A protein has these predicted regions:
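Active-site-proximal helix/loop segments of hydrolytic enzymes
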Residues: 1-122
Length: 122
């Protein structure tokens, strides 16, 4: 749901923050460039993306690094998931279905559980 107007973009994508010295922290000085937090965010992004694609069959738009403040200014592992494109009429019809919401919720929970198992198993 990142565009305006009508598009044919579709699928699911997940973002995590990788340190960029161009973006200095405004809130999160202590954990801004914490290697463990950043590594766990990358693992979380991959686990959630894998689970979402497996559960929904949506187009895999991948896992990407970004410098969004919502990711940068956290003290814990963080991701941003784009679950679809509301400006694509056919995708919007899928996004509006209650059954699809249930599958998304299940996949998000499963991805978080898989992430937890991966980071706790270190």
């Amino acid at each position: 749901a990142t565009g305006a107007g009508v598009s044919n973009a579709s699928g699911i994508e997940t973002y995590w923050y990788q340190y960029d010295p161009e973006y200095q922290p405004k809130i999160n000085q202590a954990m801004h460039n914490n290697p463990a937090r950043l590594a766990e965010s990358e693992i979380l992004a991959n686990k959630v993306q894998e689970s979402l694609i497996s559960e929904t069959g949506a187009i895999n738009r991948g896992v990407r690094r970004e410098t969004f403040a919502v990711l940068r200014e956290t003290a814990i592992p963080a991701i941003l998931v784009e679950l679809g494109f509301m400006d694509n009429p056919s995708e919007l019809q899928v996004i509006k279905q209650d059954a699809y919401h249930t599958r998304l919720a299940k996949a998000l929970a499963e991805g978080i559980i898989n992430w937890y198992g991966a980071v706790e198993g270190k």
